[in-house]
A protein has these predicted regions:
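Residues within mature, well-folded domains
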Residues: 1-76
Length: 76
């Protein structure tokens, strides 16, 4: 969908960047998960009747974002 494409385009900007950039833009994560080999920042936000969840997978040694995942996030 167009909304999912927009979400992907927005989140792709963080790939290869330092994890502090995500915190500067989105604030402190709702949760931090340590799942080898990644440190995962989880951001949750309610949007109408669904909860938007974004996950950023950070390579801890270099502190760089290597991938992301997004569920139920709507960009208007």
């Amino acid at each position: 969908s167009k909304s999912q494409e927009e979400e992907k385009r927005i989140l792709e900007q963080y790939l290869g960047k330092n994890s502090s950039l995500v915190k500067d833009k989105l604030g402190e994560p709702s949760q931090i998960i340590f799942e080898s080999p990644y440190k995962i920042y989880v951001y949750k936000k309610s949007q109408m009747i669904v909860t938007c969840e974004r996950r950023f997978y950070i390579e801890p040694k270099k502190d760089l974002i290597e991938k992301f995942d997004s569920k139920n996030c709507i960009n208007k």
